[in-house]
Amino acid sequence: MIKAHIFIDAGHLHYHLFKEQWRIDYAKLIEYFSQKDYFPLMVFYYEGMITEQSYFSKHPNATPKEFNQAKKNKKAYFGKLRSLNFTVRWKPVHRIFDLESKEYRFKCNFDVELTMDVMETVLTRETDTFIICSGDGDFTRLIKFLKGKAKNIIVAGFKNSINKGLLDVAHQIVFLEAIKHKIEWK
């Protein structure tokens, strides 16, 4: 088995999943890589936690009770991932003003956290393969660095949302829609 660390940029993946109206069962995703002869030493999962501002902007007719339940559900979901030995990184979703569109939007970016976890892994753990589940082009430089350290890089994401830079630098690409039947939450 090939030792691997897996990094899941859930915020990036969820945007596409929301449009396509399906969900990933992350335990099945890890199982998929295990069946491909990768032994996941650690799995890191990054996702934003809803805030009142973000929740009520998307659900203006919701009640405080519904918000509290949604937040409780998200915390329970993170707990389930932890029970599967995932390292869960979360922070609040923030509202930012987009100068281009002149509208507010919600953002929770984990580029720095994911990069720091990768760097710490390179420095402190013996691993052969890094599996980055994201299509975010901001990780192109990170992947080039890992390749320079003779690491195998797999990028898993959606065909129409993986940045071209990632396609050019990764050793292998896994299109999640191609394995939907194996990883979909049912």
Q: How would you name each of these model-derived features?
A:
Residues M1-F106, N152-G157, S161:
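Domain-level signal for Mg2+-assisted phosphodiester chemistry and nucleotide/NA-binding surfaces
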